[in-house]
Each structure stands twice: as C-alpha cells, then as structure tokens.
C-alpha cells in the first residue's frame, strides 16, 4: 500500500496488520496529514493543551538531591498535566482526529491505567463513547485508575488471556478494532504499533521537548548535556527527544526497565536484550523465545511492562544517536523514595527509572559539571499502594 508518510525508520516500523485494517490506517494517515496543515485543527489542539491540560508544564530545578556534586538537574513536569501524565497530550490530538473522521467511539488499551484515564477524559470532553482493554493483572494493581476511568464513563474490559498484562490488552483492542473501525477509532497509547501511529504519537508529544528546549535556554542560557526519559513503548521519550535529535551535542538517553535484573530474564528491555521481529503491527526489537514466541516482559511499573518498543527508538539505537540503558526495580524504587524525601515530589514508578539513571550519572562522577533534564513523565499517586506493600514487606514502614 502506498502511504503519504514514510512508514519506516530505517528498517523498523511498517504496517503488519490484517488486510481488513488497511483502509482504517489509510484513513487515519490522511486525516492526520490534512490536520497538520489545518490552522483550525492546530488552534483547537493548542487551546485544549493550554486551557484544559495545563500546558506549558514547569521545568523544575532540583534543590537538594544534587548536593555535593557539580550536576544541575531539572525535571520536566509532565506529572503536573491534567490526568497526571504525558499521556493527556496525544490523546487530545487523537480524539480530535477521531471527530474529524466522523468516528463516535474510542477503543484503547492501557497498562498502568494512565493512557486509559487520558482516553476516558478526552472521550468525556469530546462526547465520544470509550471502551478500554486492560490486562486483568493490571486492573488489580491499578484499581484507582480503573475507578477514574469508570467515573468518566469509560467501559473497562479486563483481559484474562496470556499474561493478562499490556501486550494482551493490545491484542484484544486490535481484535475489537478489526470489527468496528467504521465507527470506532483505535487510540493507541504509545509511539509504537503500525504506521502511522508512531509518527502521530511523536508529533502529538513533541511539545515536551520543544518546551524543554525553550525553558532550559531561558534558565541556563544553553542546551542540556543530556535529556533522559523512561522507555516502555516510548512515547514520553520520543516526545522529549524529537526536538533535540538534530542537536548533536545533546545526549539522548532512554531508560528501559531492568526488572529483577537483566540476567534473570525478568525485565522489559527489548532494545538492548531482545531480537528484531514482527509484533503489534510493526517490525521492532522484542523479547522473544528461541522459536519466536513473544516472551513475557516484567517491570515493577505497569506502564513499562511491554515486550517491544517503538520503531523510532529502535532506529535511534541502531544509528547510535540515542543511548539506551536499563534500571532495575530496586534502583527505580530508591529514586522514587529519594525524590519524595528530598524534593517533595512523588514521581510515577515509570519516571523513577529515568530519575534513577540521572542519579547514577551524578553519583558516578560527582566532580563532573553536567546539565541534565529528566522527563518526569507522570505522578506517582497511582503507585503508592504498590510502593507501600513493598516497603511494608521489607519492614521499612
């Protein structure tokens, strides 16, 4: 099928979906391309970002955790966005696209529940019906977000197949869309999946990096040495990276979930520890068994518990433009506690992975003068019960 935009990032990406979904993807691409050129659409999107979601978000300089080092550390505060995470940015854009295409329903998948909450709020705001697929395990560990979705009128459908987590929710959402695309828009929650989703999600998240660039220049008079973001599917990271890709002096660091440790096999780090394959409509690195079956990923944070990664991250990794590292559950938990105790900010466990790597960079080289920005992609209200149970089991509380 000919496309208006390039469906690949190097060898990664593409449109590996059943033939029945090709017209829906073509319609979506056409709507997106025309919307990008439509000043009225852009004005409506920007108005929602400013007056509903609360953009621009703050860039906060850490006051205490850098003590004794020469690091200056800023946090891009996506946790302050309405809905509690960066997810709100792109769902507002996709919901407007759905209306533009004449759709009346939204289908979504969610892991941590943040994309589900964002999909529910955008649907409520714009008068769209919303059904959300969520792994049964995630329904259990993210009950506050499940209730938020239901409060805003969304139907939450627990998925019991497979590992009962995000990858299974993705499969069910795609299955639903195959039979309902004439009236429903599939609101994919990350910068992954079949073309044109990785491009759409990047463009509807790129204000994160654009704002960061303007804010850091105003505050410090120069660009950062590195921007750091956690990577599950990769939307918050690509939103932060997009405006810095051509700034070759700025390091781009993506942080995958190391789970219980890479050597245990219980992690979610396919970029560095997976093999390229076809999954979820795209060609990308993924965690798979010797015979090509998708392996279960694992992370303390439901939002990073995904066995593959967006194709643009795969490309940035293959060209060496971005570096990808991993952080274990324990390291993320320590960073979570550190930010709570010393800066009075409760971060999402997802974002705590990025913070943990920044703290590691700082502590490994305390003499080095460096200017770092961490994308604090979401707030940790949804994670307090998980953290409470772990700390209680350890006898720390």
UniProtKB/Swiss-Prot annotation:
Its EC number is 4.2.1.20. The lineage of its organism: Bacteria, Pseudomonadati, Pseudomonadota, Gammaproteobacteria, Enterobacterales. This is Tryptophan synthase beta chain. Keywords: Amino-acid biosynthesis, Aromatic amino acid biosynthesis, Lyase, Pyridoxal phosphate, Tryptophan biosynthesis. Gene3D superfamilies: 3.40.50.1100. Tetramer of two alpha and two beta chains. SUPFAM superfamilies: Tryptophan synthase beta subunit-like PLP-dependent enzymes (SSF53686). Its cofactor is pyridoxal 5'-phosphate. The modification N6-(pyridoxal phosphate)lysine is found at residue 87. Pathway: Amino-acid biosynthesis; L-tryptophan biosynthesis; L-tryptophan from chorismate: step 5/5. The gene is trpB.
């Amino acid at each position: 099928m000919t496309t208006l935009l390039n469906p690949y990032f190097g060898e990664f990406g593409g449109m590996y979906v059943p033939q029945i979904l090709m017209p829906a993807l073509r319609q979506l691409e056409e709507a997106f391309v025309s919307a990008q050129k439509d000043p009225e659409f852009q004005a409506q999107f920007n108005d929602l970002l400013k007056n509903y979601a609360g953009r621009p978000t703050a860039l906060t300089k850490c006051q205490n955790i850098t003590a004794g080092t020469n690091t200056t550390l800023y946090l891009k505060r996506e946790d302050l966005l309405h809905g509690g995470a960066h997810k709100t940015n792109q769902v507002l854009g996709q919901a407007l696209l759905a209306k533009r295409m004449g759709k009346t329903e939204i289908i979504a998948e969610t892991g941590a529940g943040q994309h589900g909450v964002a999909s529910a709020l955008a649907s409520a705001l714009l008068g769209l019906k919303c059904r959300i697929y969520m792994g049964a395990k995630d329904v259990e560990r993210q009950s506050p977000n499940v209730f938020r979705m239901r409060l805003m009128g969304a139907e939450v459908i627990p998925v019991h197949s497979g590992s009962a987590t995000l990858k299974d929710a993705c499969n069910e959402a795609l299955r639903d869309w195959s039979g309902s695309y004439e009236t429903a828009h599939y609101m994919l929650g990350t910068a992954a999946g079949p073309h044109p989703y990785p491009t759409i999600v990047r463009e509807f998240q790129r204000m994160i990096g654009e704002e960061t660039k303007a804010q850091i220049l105003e505050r410090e008079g120069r660009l950062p040495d590195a921007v750091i973001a956690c990577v599950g599917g990769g939307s918050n990271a690509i939103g932060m990276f997009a405006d810095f890709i051509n700034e070759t002096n700025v390091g781009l660091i993506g942080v995958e979930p190391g789970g219980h440790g890479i050597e245990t096999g219980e992690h979610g780090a396919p970029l560095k520890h997976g093999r390229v394959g076809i999954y979820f409509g795209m060609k990308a690195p993924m965690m798979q068994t010797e015979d090509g079956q998708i392996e279960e990923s694992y992370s303390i944070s439901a939002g990073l518990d995904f066995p593959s990664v967006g194709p643009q991250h795969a490309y940035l990794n293959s060209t060496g433009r971005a570096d990808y590292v991993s952080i274990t559950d324990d390291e993320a938990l320590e960073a979570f506690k550190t930010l709570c105790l010393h800066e009075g900010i409760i971060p999402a466990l997802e974002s705590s992975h990025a913070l943990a790597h920044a703290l590691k960079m700082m502590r490994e080289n305390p003499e080095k003068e460096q200017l770092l920005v961490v994308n604090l992609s979401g707030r940790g209200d949804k994670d307090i019960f998980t953290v409470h149970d772990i700390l209680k089991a350890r006898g720390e509380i």
